[in-house]
Structures are given as C-alpha cells and as structure tokens.
A protein has these predicted regions:
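Active-site neighborhoods of divalent-metal-dependent phosphate/nucleic-acid chemistry enzymes
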Residues: 71-121, 128
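Residues that scaffold the ATP/ADP-binding catalytic core of kinase and kinase-like folds
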Residues: 13-14, 46, 122-123
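Phosphate- and divalent-cation-binding pockets in alpha/beta enzyme and binding domains
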Residues: 22, 42, 82, 121-122
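Active-site-proximal, substrate-binding regions of enzyme catalytic domains
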Residues: 41-73, 78-84
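Short active-site oxyanion
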Residues: 1, 30-33, 68-71, 107-111
C-alpha cells in the first residue's frame, strides 16, 4: 500500500512530541512512502524553529536520509491547479491544499498520514483513509 506523509507526521520523527511513537509506527510499515516537494520546506522550516545546534544538524541530516527513501510528487502546474481547486472547495490552508492535491494525484486508494486535525477532516471528506489524526 502507498502512504502519503505530510509534514506534521514527519516532524514527529525528529522532534519528541505527543504521538511521536504513533507516527514512528505508521512510518515503519512496508508501505511505499510518498510526499510532496513542498514538505522539504515545511519540515526544515519547523526543525529550524524548534531545534538548534547539534540537535538541528542531526535532525536535518536524518530528514535528508529519510527523504531519499520517499517518492516525491513535484508541484507542477497540474498539482497546483488541483490544490487550488481543493482549497476553493474546502477552505483548506495553502500548504494543506498542496499536500491534498499532491496526494490526490495518486488517487484515493492510499493512506494519508497526518497529525493535523483540520487537514485530516478535509482529507476524509475527499475520500482518503486517514491515519494519525
């Protein structure tokens, strides 16, 4: 099975937060892991906001290593147009709409892993099976 992973789920691998253990278990499956290109910006921005020094450097390195095992959905025109339509129809925040648009490019027969409750609600209304939130 394929799992689309958003930034909220990935961050829990590098920052000890509520449900970090749940996120780790979801990401440790044999599923093909997929994310959008913009996840790089979102995760690195949040790592820099939450960590510093050696912890930041180690987390960034671990993220880069982990990301190399993901399939990446590029934010091309079709993905952005789909995300814009989702945002218009659901009121999703911009980055959430990009995640949902990227995942929708793969169809709805995948797990959508997020710990963002607003995004999870919208993902469910779009027909995704949500894990995490």
């Amino acid at each position: 099975m394929t799992s689309y992973v958003d930034a909220s789920a990935l961050l829990k691998r590098y920052v000890d937060e509520t449900d970090s253990d749940v996120a780790e278990a979801l990401l440790a499956t044999d599923a093909e892991l997929v994310t959008g290109r913009h996840t790089v910006v979102e995760v690195r921005r949040n790592l820099a906001r939450m960590l510093s020094g050696t912890a930041l450097a180690e987390s960034r390195a671990a993220f880069a290593t982990d990301l190399s095992s993901f399939s990446i959905i590029e934010l091309d025109g079709a993905t952005c147009e789909l995300a814009a339509t989702i945002a218009e129809q659901t009121g999703a925040r911009s980055l959430d709409a990009l995640h949902l648009g990227a995942a929708r490019r793969l169809g709805t027969a995948l797990a959508f892993i997020t710990f963002d409750h607003r995004q999870a609600y919208i993902a469910r209304t779009l027909g995704f099976r949500v894990a995490g939130a």
